[in-house]
C-alpha cells in the first residue's frame, strides 16, 4: 500500500465530510465482516509481458495485475460479500469472457452489464458488471453508454 495514496484518500473524505472507515491493506488480507456491496476498479492489464509494465510505481500498481490477479480478486469478493450482496466491477470490455469465468468459479453470475464506448460506431472499451451469487436467472444488458455523449449516461435516482 502507498501511504501517500492512503493519506490523500483520508483528506478527500474529510474535505467532503464523508463518514467512512479506511483500512490500508490488500483485499486479499482484509478480515472483517462481509459487505452488502463491493465496488471495484481493479488493475486492467495482465502481467504476462514485463516489458510493457509501467515504470511509475503508482501507475504500475493501478494498471497491472501483479498485486491483484483476477483470481485473487474474485476469491476475496466471495469471502467478503454477503450472500445477497452485489459486486460492481468496471473493467476492459475485451476481458469480459475472462471476468465471467472467474466469477462463475466462485459461484457468481452477472445480473447487469453495461458496455461503454468512446463514440457511436466504436468498439466497446469498458464494461460495468454487477455480479451476484448464482441465485440470479437473468442478466440485464443495459443500454450502451457513449463517453462522448453525456445524455447516454444513466441517471442516479
What is the predicted role of each segment?
Residues 1-40, 46-52, 75:
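Conserved SAM/SAH cofactor-binding pocket of Class I
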Residues 121-157:
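SAM/dcSAM-binding transferase cores
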Residues 66-124:
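Conserved Class I SAM-dependent methyltransferase catalytic core
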Residues 41-42, 109:
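Hydrophobic alpha-helix-in-membranes signature
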Residues 42-72:
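Mobile active-site "lid"/loop adjacent to the S-adenosyl-L-methionine
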Residues 45, 106, 134:
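Phosphate/oxyanion-binding loops and surfaces in catalytic or ligand/nucleic-acid-binding neighborhoods
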